[in-house]
Amino acid sequence: MNVAIVKYNAGNIYSVVNALRRMSIEPLLTDDAEQLQKADRVMFPGQGHAAEAMEYLKARRLDEVIRDLKQPVFGICVGQQLLCKHSEEGDVDCIGIFDADVKRFQPQKHEDKVPCMGWNKLSLPQSLQNEGSVNPLYKGILSPLPLEGSREAFVYFVHSYYVPVCQHTIATADYILPYSASMHKDNFYTCQFHPEKSGKVGEQIIKNFLEL
C-alpha cells in the first residue's frame, strides 16, 4: 500500500512516520501534489499554529490539493483542525471540509489547565449511540454498548484548541466540556488525539484507517 504523509511546517510528523514503519509500511513524506493524488491513503498529521500552517499550505496550493483528494485522508491533531472551516488560533480560514469552527479551551475552574495534555477516554456521540452504530475507524475499539475497565479506549491528547461536537463527530472526549475527538465526512477522517502515541488502541485505529 502506498501511504503518503503531507509534508508542511508542522511538528510531530515523524512520530507518525515511525508508527507506520512499526507496521512495516514505509510512507512517503511529500508536499508534491501528484504524489499525494496518486497515494492509496493520505495522512495529514502535525502539531503547530493553525494560521502559520495555513499560510504554508496556501502558498503551495496544498489546501486545494488536500480539499480535492478522493482517497481516504486521515487528519491528526492540528490536521483535524485545519480541515475545519475556521480556527480561532490566528483567526484563520482553514481548508473547510468540515462545517465546524475550532475554538480555544476556556478554563472554568482553577484545575482546568490549557493545553489539555494526557490520556483521556473516547466515547461515542449520542447520535451514534442512538443508532447503535460505530464508524469503521473505531471497529473493535468503541461500542454502542457500555464498556468498562480494560475495554474502555484511552488515547493521548496534547492540544489547546478543540472542535465542538457537531454532525460530523464520530467520537467524543471530555475536557472542560465534551468535544469532537474524531470526525468523518466522505473520504475524510480525523482525530484530535495522537494515535501514534496511544499504544495498542492507537495502532488499531491506524490499521482501521488503512483498511478503509
Locations of regions flagged by a protein language model:
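Extreme N-terminal starter segment of soluble prokaryotic enzymes
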Residues: 1-4
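Conserved Rossmann-like nucleotide-cofactor binding loop
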Residues: 11
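An anion/phosphate-binding loop that grips the pyrophosphate of nucleotide cofactors and donors
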Residues: 39
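Structural motif
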Residues: 43-45
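Cysteine-nucleophile active-site neighborhood
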Residues: 48-120, 126
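Amide-donor transfer/coupling interface in amidating biosynthetic enzymes
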Residues: 68, 101-212
